[in-house]
Each structure stands twice: as structure tokens, then as C-alpha cells.
């Protein structure tokens, strides 16, 4: 019997890809007006900044997702002053991102039904904590969340077992009583199963492109909650 359901956040409860595009569009506008560079040049500097970050801090850390650090690296590449641009660009990106964010179809109804059945609901996510809280508030999911585990708190990124251990610890149940739903096969699903949780691959409204030996979920609108809780 399932007693807790833990969700990845980005590209699971909402579309990260769509909202990142809005954030980048706003960032490109600022760079065009302020530095006189094209959208393509902004994107290239943004990519190069990501490579620099990976070399400096590694990839198994929440800091790799920090937009503040990414934009700081961009200013270093452009040889522009850090102040006031880094903070301005940070807020421009995230304001545009959050302005357009919406939950994926069926997500809030599913969370509500889990809450009615007294199922513990958590988030297990690779990212810094503050912005993940903002995203959950923006999609209206915050009222359903019992616990959070970010890679910033865990000190490691998925699929490291420690992040999943923290999810189970905070859920207050056994690992086998805990489902983990996410969009990334390696990080979310294989990581969950290898840590003793039941991983379910959310395929983002698409049919799986390859055969997998674990459960899949195409859409949150298709879930019969009682069957879901007893059949997993």
C-alpha cells in the first residue's frame, strides 16, 4: 500500500522547458538593449557560462543550477560590470519565468485527491531551495506539499541515493511504501528504484519512445487515484 508520493518538480508538475523559453526571451531583450548583442549571442554566452560553472564547481551540486552564478559568469565573459547587471538579469529571467508558469494538466486535482486520502506528499528536486518554493506557490501546489528535499539540502544531485533517503525519512514511511514520480529516467526513476522506492516515469503527455521495465504515466488526467494507490 502506498503511503507517500514524492514528485520531481521541473518538467513533472509543470513545463520547465516552456517557461525557461520565456525567461530567456526576457533575458535576450535586456542584453540586446543594454549590451547591443543579438539573441543568438546571448544564448551562446549563456551556454559558455554553463561550461565555466561546470568546470569550476562540478555538476553534482545544486549550485550548478544557480542563475545568479550563471549570469555572473556571463558578465565575466562579456567583460561587463557585475553591478547592477547580474541582479537585474536574475530578476528579469525569473520574473518572466514565473509570470507564465502553470501546473501540468491534472496535477492539482491529483494532489488534492492524494491529500483527501491522507497520503504524504513531497518534492524531491535538483535545484536551490528558494526558487523551487516560488515555483510551487506560482502553480498553486504549495497547499498540498508536506515536505521538500532539494539537492541544495541533500548536498548531492539525483540519482544519488542520499537525496532519496531524505525523501523517505521525511515521508515517515518505508521506502517500499513510497512512490517517486519524475520525467528523467536516469535521475528520477532508476535513482528511485535503486534506492528502494517505486519509480514511475512521467512521459510528459507523450507515448514512451522505448521499452522500459518500470511503470509509466503519460498524463496526470488519466489517473484513477484509488487504483494508483493499491496497484503500485
Each model region followed by its residue ranges:
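N-terminal helical cap/lid subdomain that shapes the substrate entry/recognition surface
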Residues: 2-105
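Asp-based, Mg2+/Mn2+-dependent phosphohydrolase catalytic module
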Residues: 1-5, 18, 33, 40, ...
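Short glycine/proline-enriched coil/turn segments at helix->beta-strand junctions
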Residues: 76-79, 117, 212-213
